[in-house]
């Protein structure tokens, strides 16, 4: 019974699915049918009727016939074929041949899409032709007005265009022929070709209008402004030469001749309507002329610099020479009391040598100024270099002078450090005396002797003449290490001795009960009396810890408490 129900349910499902799928396919057919009808109703005939209003000759006639044939084929052949395919699709559906129906629907959709594109293309081309005719008709009248205005301007102001006027005339006459060509193409129905003529004509007239606007200004530059500037430069050059300026290195006369020749080339470019080249050449000429002005101005400013700065630079050298002389005397004095490293002596000799070279160089520049055979710009460069070297030497001289002053300062600092270390050593000895130790261990006594000797060595170094500060600094560093180590060893030794003594006292309570403790403490006392406080502490701690673990911690606490009370 269950199997029967399952079969019935499956059958019902198949029937429902089949019904839904057929319904969906019929909706697809209806959509394609509507698309086909919409294409058939497109206003292509109306658009083609607009073309008939144009001159139906030449290119227009050929295009019209092609579009009409395309549309007739779409309506009479291609759309009926689509209708037949839709009918075949319905037949496949009625026979439940869904796969064939689905495949045919895809083919119909592709075909309608191609027809859609073809119809769009026809309408777009028609609109382009009609729009081209309308736009060309409007623009050609505007261009005629531009052409008339250009001819009037050329006639009225011909003198402002110079040699370019004849070629402008030729170009405007050639433009008239293009107007005639446009009329013939339009009359022959070749509207698209006529449109191309309009575009070319517009480009040509725009170019001529731009030229006619720019040529007068360019001619003014080349015929008036630039030659006037060259003449002004030539006059200025001659005046400066007469005033004593040396300008041979600028080659002004040759450069001015080159600029004059370049102006002639620019005029030729304008006459040939090579306006962009002419504009670039004029811009280059302006920049080059500005450069010439700058070069002459540079010489004037350099002359002012030389006249005003020479005395000041001479004063700088005189002042520096006086300072160097004082430093030389100071260095001689310092050498009697201090040892100067070879590098410092070499530095000072280098400063003296540079000083002589700078003075010699300044005298040479003075001679060249007096001879008046060198350009002021070159003299200025040399003076500026000289000032830079003077500034560098002043800095080196100041550093050397400060180094000499620092030597005395370093000596005072070294003596202060020696006093501090002596106090540190005295503090170590005071701690030893205060602790009332029975004696000093031999290693400690050796360290004490070493520390005293290191301080004596520093004192001896400080009394040497000349004083060698690097050697003093090395001796100070050695003494510092020795004294610091002695102080630390002193504190450690006193602490060990005090703890050893306290541990022995603490262990006395176990002497009678434990022979081993008695023996261990006796050994610790022996070591203590022989100044071996470190071993005495170790022996005492080991002895009391053997009978009372943690005893040394208690000893330390008692010892710390005693120290705090004393403080």
Curated annotation (Swiss-Prot):
Extracellular side: 1-2
Keywords of this entry: Cell cycle, Cell division, Cell membrane, Coiled coil, Membrane, Septation, Transmembrane, Transmembrane helix
Coiled coil spans: 97-158, 268-304, 346-497
Biological process, per Gene Ontology: division septum assembly; septin ring assembly
Main location class: membrane
Transmembrane segments: 3-21
GO cellular component: plasma membrane; septin ring
Residue intervals on the Cytoplasmic side: 22-567
Taxonomy, superkingdom: Bacteria
Membrane topology of this protein: Single-pass membrane protein
InterPro entries xrefs: EzrA
Cell compartment(s), UniProt: Cell membrane
Job description of the protein: Negative regulator of FtsZ ring formation; modulates the frequency and position of FtsZ ring formation. Inhibits FtsZ ring formation at polar sites. Interacts either with FtsZ or with one of its binding partners to promote depolymerization.
Family: Belongs to the EzrA family.
Protein name (Swiss-Prot/TrEMBL): Septation ring formation regulator EzrA
Organism: Geobacillus thermodenitrificans (strain NG80-2)
